[in-house]
């Protein structure tokens, strides 16, 4: 089944394939399994296993439950910004067939913190550890304020917050890397 889905997605440009994957994952067609031997504890957070998915796939919290059902013990959504934004102009996702890889230059495209918060409010039970990756809007005049606003708004809906300071596609962001 998985090979069939991957084969099907290759007929689309990478960004459309990403959107289709998000839609499929949001339907929760998958089942999960637990293996007690793989339980991992980090800083008082218990993970079902040591495999997590970093931010970038589910940018706006649309399908993280489906991702948990694939077997990931943690999912990080985002990068979420205070206001929704479109990100960089297309094309911004490129397949490297020989390397079996993808390069993305999305630029923090997401629905914004209020929309993400409303999605998280609808979830009654999570099937794993949820992180939220946060960043400033592309045209922000005060990125530090953006981080503060988002962290305060979304931290109670997640197990942890990750602060994104390394996107080369967001002007001035890498200045925070020190």
Briefly describe each language-model feature range.
Residues 76-88, 155, 159-166:
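Non-cysteine beta-strand/loop elements that form the S-adenosyl-L-methionine
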Residues 2-40, 104-109:
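An N-cap/entry alpha-helix motif that binds or orients negatively charged groups
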Residues 47, 63-85:
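Active-site cofactor/substrate anionic-group-binding motifs, chiefly glycine-
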Residues 47, 55-58, 109-178:
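Conserved alpha/beta-domain cores
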Residues 78, 82-127:
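A gly/proline- and charged-residue-enriched helix-loop-helix capping module
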Residues 25-62:
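Active-site-flanking structural segment that lines cofactor/substrate pockets
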Residues 13, 86-90, 174-175:
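Short secondary-structure transition/capping segments
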């Amino acid at each position: 089944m998985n090979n069939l889905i991957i084969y099907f997605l290759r007929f689309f440009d990478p960004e459309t394939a990403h959107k289709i994957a998000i839609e499929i994952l949001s339907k929760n067609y998958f089942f999960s399994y637990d293996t007690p031997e793989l339980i991992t504890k980090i800083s008082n957070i218990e993970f079902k296993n040591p495999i997590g998915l970093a931010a970038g796939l589910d940018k706006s919290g649309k399908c993280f439950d489906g991702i948990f059902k694939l077997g990931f013990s943690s999912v990080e959504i985002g990068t979420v910004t205070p206001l929704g934004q479109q990100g960089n102009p297309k094309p911004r996702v490129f397949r490297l067939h020989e390397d079996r890889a993808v390069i993305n230059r999305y630029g923090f495209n997401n629905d914004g913190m209020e929309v993400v918060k409303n999605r998280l409010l609808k979830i009654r039970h999570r099937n794993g550890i949820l992180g939220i990756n946060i960043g400033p809007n592309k045209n922000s005049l005060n990125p530090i304020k953006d981080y503060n606003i988002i962290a305060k708004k979304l931290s109670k809906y997640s197990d942890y917050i990750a602060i994104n300071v390394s996107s080369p596609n967001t002007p001035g962001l890498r200045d925070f890397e020190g």
